[in-house]
């Protein structure tokens, strides 16, 4: 009877070899059996060219044209509110308005300045007596400026004007008379300075028109 020997080293090598081959085969079979999902080119193009979903960081394309189009078409969002800058944002338009106190002063002023669809400058020379006020002479210098005043913008929109430059000084020729009732008023000096400044502004406006 012959000796029957078992080579354990050879068996171990075969087991290791078979196990490694089986693991490789299983990995290959798993890879081959796995469903390969590819991205549709139309959907990808739609994504990259969509302003609602693309940001400036989505510039990973290797195609320079696509990359530049992504950056150019990317939406700029607010960091806090994430609001698209492409959306129409309504802004409150600030409408400049004349102060009511200035308006009232112009309406009630004895200088004859009134605003009623235009600027009408009329001047009356008044002389006061002790018992009565008598109008000795009346000088009506009417510089009617037909100006379209846009109430919304609060600006002068000159349409037409009829005035001579040499007639401008005549409007204010008797402004600085001392015959007014407020000659002893402590604010008279300040009032005269302010009135003179307003006159200069009005003269400049009329001259420029």
UniProtKB/Swiss-Prot annotation:
* Post-translational modifications: O-glycosylated.
GO CC annotations? Answer: host cell cytoplasm
Please indicate if the UniProt record lists Nucleotide-binding as a keyword: yes
Q: Spell out the Pfam families in the cross-references.
A: Rota_NS26
UniProt cofactor(s): Mg(2+)
Report the record's Gene Ontology biological process terms.
Answer: viral genome replication
Q: State the protein's name.
A: Non-structural protein 5
List the top taxonomic levels of the source: Viruses, Riboviria, Orthornavirae, Duplornaviricota, Resentoviricetes
